[in-house]
Amino acid sequence: MEQKILCEVNNCSYWGKGNKCTADAIYVVSHTGETAENSRETDCKTFKPHDL
């Protein structure tokens, strides 16, 4: 099955054409424990900045 994970963080190493995440897996966490009320309470821990 094809993954369709979209990402708009264009300075991430895994960012690809069409805003597609190219990581093999992603790790998303909640700031507030096990649950989140909205997307602002979450973080993508897979983020890896481009080498400058």
From Swiss-Prot:
Protein name: Uncharacterized protein YtzL
Source species, domain of life: Bacteria
Gene: ytzL
Record-linked InterPro entries: DUF1540
Upper lineage: Bacteria, Bacillati, Bacillota, Bacilli, Bacillales
